[in-house]
């Protein structure tokens, strides 16, 4: 009973962090439309400064995040100018150093999650034993929030570290968990077309997420595609999917 409650609580925290991430992404998309008329370099600078404002308001105690985005902003501006080959090499080297620092800082900020990450990495390599969520120390929302923000800053390194191309069997195990959870949508209420396309027998939507085109899919289905595929098309309307948010009406 206790382990079940811990697992449910952990998934809730992860979904809360995901909501914050997706909301930020949708706001960024809206801002992109607003500044669409600007030159590419100017538009990128504006978005970087908006990022700085967001981090300053939400993560005032995380000074390293603030510093990282400032450095990335400067490097992005330098990268737009005509620089000599040697200077460009230095800029690229500094960019790598910044991402490595961000990676280390992000990992150290995730208190209580290291043991679970080690178990998950072991599973991704051997696929022998998926770690039990409820058997590890509970996370705080601030730790998850810090990690999500860090993931946006050093996404390339995070993808490599956590093996973004998660085996299909991991998603199956996730689906097995969510199918028995309260977020499961009954078969007659909604079907996940991504599950149908994949030939999955579990076509009832679990943990529903609605895309910007208005169609709803399973959290695991839509988020895995958004992370792995550059241009994700909606199976129903064929429009490009830019982001997805939790569907409160179906949950």
UniProtKB/Swiss-Prot annotation:
Transmembrane regions listed in the UniProt entry: none
One GO process term, biological-process aspect: ERAD pathway
Highest taxon, organism lineage: Eukaryota
Gene Ontology, cellular component aspect: cytoplasm
RING-type zinc-finger residues: 192-238
Localization terms from the record: Cytoplasm
Keywords per UniProt: Cytoplasm, Metal-binding, Zinc, Zinc-finger
Database matches in InterPro entries: Znf-RING_euk, Znf_RING, Znf_RING/FYVE/PHD, Znf_RING_CS
Alphabetized SUPFAM superfamilies for the sequence: RING/U-box (SSF57850)
Pfam families listed in its UniProt record: zf-RING_UBOX
Molecular-function GO terms, alphabetical: ubiquitin protein ligase activity; zinc ion binding
Protein name (Swiss-Prot/TrEMBL): Uncharacterized RING finger protein C23A1.07
